[in-house]
A protein has these predicted regions:
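Basic, Lys/Arg-enriched alpha-helical interface segments
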Residues: 1-79, 87-93, 101-106
């Protein structure tokens, strides 16, 4: 016998739209060519962000940024490998990816 779920428990919002900044696309190509970083794990984080309306779980160390990056969030893909993103309404925009020194040194 199968249990029936009420209709309200089956409803969900559609996934967010996504976009990426030119700087993110350049970072992606550079990091993919280097072979030093787990791009599949980065893609996993991106898909979770697109599919959910909430910040990532604690294992991603997802947090808001301050200063010049005040309207952005950062998550740790692995070690010092980071993803910087922001939301604009129902759209998530991937801004940069790389290490702390690559992203925050002037």
């Amino acid at each position: 016998m199968t249990s029936r779920k009420p209709a309200s428990s089956k409803r969900a919002a559609p996934p967010r739209a996504s976009d990426s900044a030119k700087s993110f696309r350049k970072d992606w190509e550079r990091l993919t060519r280097s072979g030093r970083y787990d791009m599949k794990r980065l893609k996993e984080a991106m898909l979770l962000l697109i599919a959910n309306d909430e910040p990532l779980g604690p294992e991603w160390l997802d947090h808001p940024l301050k200063g010049d990056w005040a309207d952005h969030r950062e998550c740790h893909i692995g070690g010092d490998f980071l993803l910087i993103y922001r939301t604009d309404g129902d759209t998530i925009i991937f801004v940069r990816t790389g290490t702390h020194s690559e992203l925050f040194e002037e």
